[in-house]
């Protein structure tokens, strides 16, 4: 034990995680991100909310027990859609668009309310809102006119879906003037886009009549409809919207969220008629119980009740974590169950080679939507649950959203059922399947180099915003390039030509010419060659190497050649890297086909070294600086790059070695840690002075 300068005795440090705990952390982080990708990008989740929440909670518990495992790239620190590329233009939110933390029972709700009370006393009132099962949308109005609509994305940058948003009848092009509430100069308003149950059923009936597959549930259909490339398709679908919050504003400073909703309604924006303001946790519990009994009385699907502190001043005091406000929580209802016939079990190969069995069932109505597909996780889970093909099974929709198979109704068996035989070879490439190591429950395809399923995922990954940021190389494009055998692997991506793309239907017009999307892809590939070194490192799909570690390595070594030549000890000594990442980097470069990818990219002109701008003075040489919260003049990446360009280290966590913490709006726990450790805290103006002049800079008040 040690003593601080103040004489306080510090608590004992947590134990370091052992190898098994580190391995489990990585497995959980990878699995959570894979499921987030399927949910936020493909609109096709494969596990229930309950299972996802269980994985995320296990990951959170590991990090709580061993804080050194917690990285800025961890799913516990990010909004759900972070780091996934799309084919829509990026749109930066004026203020962060966060997610929500969940509670599942009265004890957890009471614990959340107790934390609120400890900070605010009895001053807080609560709003109880229905948690609509849809897709989040942010609208920006300037001088009363709709300027932009964007999806949540990673909370800082979403997808620009303005044209599609304009087709939704509930969204006004202009705000209606009000004597009580003057229209503000700037209004960023958040809401949920959804289908009413009747409209969803009508949409699916139409799709089936046209010979097209129906949507699995209203949430998926809302997300898919909002993200249509052709706004005319969106316009034909009866999307609705309800506003449930505000972001950045100019000329509008409501004292409470309740007042904000009154103003939104006065301006012609859609707000819920079911929102209730209460004073006590007991009243909150009453509203939750009421809607638990009446959730199917609403015209749209709900999967819980959102509880928010009403007073804006108290919201600011409570702040937010990196992914969710502390002043709001979603109470999620228990799942609903139904029985149906299990027709077949088939497998799917994921990005990491994991082979997952799926249950194909007779469609059944549960929790307000029709379900015909559910995950069975792995072969061990199939055996554990004792399900046979042909069984009548119990399925559950956790959170009223995603189905899972609970088990068979054994009494209904008639002797025609048969056991599921897990395939011995990969259904995509034919390679013999095996566990990654002895004792693993998951079976994997070891053909990581050329398995089409894994290669698709790697192509999609390297095109993401956290890597090369190649617009136009989405999931559909990656699939088309591989299906046409235009490229054998990602190493050949940067030598693509117009003739190559003409071999794919996706990039060819009816006249046999290169499409506009094909031309854009070639232009974006050329542009991607000039991306900084850290993005190249992320794009290589080296295990454990995310943007934070990649930046640290790029800053320290300056070139890919130097990184490859460095010893494991030299790599591990870099702040933000450590022994696990160092070992993964060294292991990666021992594989011949990995090095071949680097050689091909280098030959194609991909930048493999960073050139420092000599005009920028190294005013921050050796200083470790942490940025937290939203800055008006910098995106998170821009702030980090400004620090690195001046010789500083853009750290992800606060320690006694931190020189400064830059705090924007809603800074969260890093600000608290800085105050606790006595680290100087700068506002945005102070940050600008630091960049221009270097230290010392006086902390903000």
Curated annotation (Swiss-Prot):
Names of the cofactor(s): Mg(2+); Mn(2+)
Main enzyme class: ligase
Active-site residues, as the UniProt record annotates them: 131 (n6-amp-lysine intermediate)
Pfam hit, one: DNA_ligase_aden
SMART domains assigned: BRCT (SM00292), LIGANc (SM00532)
Enzyme Commission designation: 6.5.1.2
Residue ranges, annotated region (Disordered): 1-23
Keywords: DNA damage, DNA repair, DNA replication, Ligase, Magnesium, Manganese, Metal-binding, NAD, Zinc
Domain BRCT: 615-701
Source taxon at top rank: Bacteria
Function: DNA ligase that catalyzes the formation of phosphodiester linkages between 5'-phosphoryl and 3'-hydroxyl groups in double-stranded DNA using NAD as a coenzyme and as the energy source for the reaction. It is essential for DNA replication and repair of damaged DNA. Probably the only ligase required for non-homologous end joining (NHEJ) repair of 3-overhangs.
Protein's name in the database: DNA ligase A
Organism per entry: Mycolicibacterium smegmatis (strain ATCC 700084 / mc(2)155) (Mycobacterium smegmatis)
Encoding gene (name): ligA
């Amino acid at each position: 034990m040690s003593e601080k300068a103040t004489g306080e005795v510090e608590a004992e440090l947590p134990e370091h995680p052992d190898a098994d705990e580190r391995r489990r952390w990585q497995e959980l982080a990878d699995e959570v991100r894979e499921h987030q990708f399927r949910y936020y990008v493909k609109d096709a989740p494969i596990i229930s909310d309950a299972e996802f929440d269980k994985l995320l909670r296990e990951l959170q518990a590991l990090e709580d027990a061993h804080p050194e495992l917690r990285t800025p790239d961890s799913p516990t620190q990010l909004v759900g859609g972070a780091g996934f590329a799309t084919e829509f233009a990026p749109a930066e939110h004026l203020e962060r668009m966060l997610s929500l933390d969940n509670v599942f029972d009265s004890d957890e709700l009471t614990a959340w309310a107790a934390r609120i009370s400890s900070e605010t006393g009895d001053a807080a009132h609560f709003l109880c809102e229905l948690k609509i099962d849809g897709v989040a949308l942010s609208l920006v109005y300037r001088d009363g006119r709709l300027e932009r609509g964007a999806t949540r994305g990673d909370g800082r940058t979403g997808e620009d879906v303005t044209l599609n948003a304009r087709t939704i009848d509930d969204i006004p092009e202009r705000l209606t003037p009000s004597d009580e509430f003057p229209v503000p100069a700037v209004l960023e308003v958040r809401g949920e886009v959804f289908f009413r149950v009747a409209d969803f059923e009508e949409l699916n009936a139409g799709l089936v009549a046209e010979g097209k597959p129906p949507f699995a549930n209203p949430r998926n259909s809302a997300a898919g409809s909002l993200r249509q490339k052709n706004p005319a398709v969106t316009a034909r679908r009866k999307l609705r919207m309800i506003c449930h919050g505000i972001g950045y504003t100019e000329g509008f400073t409501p004292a409470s969220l309740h007042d904000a909703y009154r103003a939104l309604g006065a301006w012609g924006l859609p707000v819920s008629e079911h929102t209730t303001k209460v004073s006590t946790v007991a009243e909150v519990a009453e509203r939750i119980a009421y809607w638990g009994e009446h959730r199917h009385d609403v015209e749209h699907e709900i999967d819980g009740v959102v509880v928010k502190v009403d007073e804006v001043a108290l919201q600011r005091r409570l702040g937010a974590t990196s992914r969710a406000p502390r002043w709001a929580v979603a109470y999620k209802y228990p799942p609903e169950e139904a029985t149906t016939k299990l027709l077949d079990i088939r497998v799917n190969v994921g990005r990491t080679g994991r082979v997952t069995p799926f249950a194909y069932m007779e469609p059944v109505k549960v929790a307000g939507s029709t379900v015909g597909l559910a995950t069975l996780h792995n072969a061990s889970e199939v055996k554990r649950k004792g399900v046979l093909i042909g069984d009548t099974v119990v399925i559950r929709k956790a959170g009223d959203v995603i189905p899972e198979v609970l088990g068979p109704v054994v009494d209904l068996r008639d002797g025609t059922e048969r056991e599921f035989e897990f395939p011995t070879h990969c259904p995509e490439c034919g390679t013999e399947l095996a566990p990654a190591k002895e004792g693993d429950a998951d079976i994997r395809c070891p053909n990581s180099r050329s398995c089409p399923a894994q290669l698709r995922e790697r192509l999609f990954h390297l095109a993401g915003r956290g890597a090369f940021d190649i617009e136009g190389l989405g999931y559909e494009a990656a699939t088309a390039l591989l299906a046409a055998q235009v490229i054998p692997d990602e190493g050949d991506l940067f030598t693509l030509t117009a003739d190559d793309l003409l071999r794919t239907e996706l990039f060819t017009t009816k006249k046999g010419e290169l499409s506009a999307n094909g031309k854009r892809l070639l232009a974006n590939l050329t542009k991607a060659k000039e991306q900084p070194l850290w993005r190249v490192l992320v794009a290589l799909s080296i295990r454990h190497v995310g943007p934070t570690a990649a930046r640290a390595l790029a800053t320290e070594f300056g070139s890919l050649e130097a990184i490859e030549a460095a010893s494991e000890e030299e790599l591990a000594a870099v702040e933000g890297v450590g022994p696990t990442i160092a070992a993964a980097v060294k292991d990666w470069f021992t594989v011949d086909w990995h090095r071949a990818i680097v050689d091909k990219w280098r030959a194609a002109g991909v930048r493999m070294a960073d050139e420092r701008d000599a005009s920028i003075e190294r005013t921050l040489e050796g200083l470790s600086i942490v940025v937290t919260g939203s800055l008006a003049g910098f995106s998170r990446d821009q702030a980090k790059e400004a620090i690195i360009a001046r010789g500083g280290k853009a750290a992800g966590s606060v320690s006694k070695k931190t020189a400064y913490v830059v705090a924007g709006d809603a800074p969260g726990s890093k600000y608290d840690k800085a105050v606790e450790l006595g680290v100087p805290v700068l506002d945005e103006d102070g940050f600008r002075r630091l960049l221009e002049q270097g230290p010392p800079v006086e902390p903000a008040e």
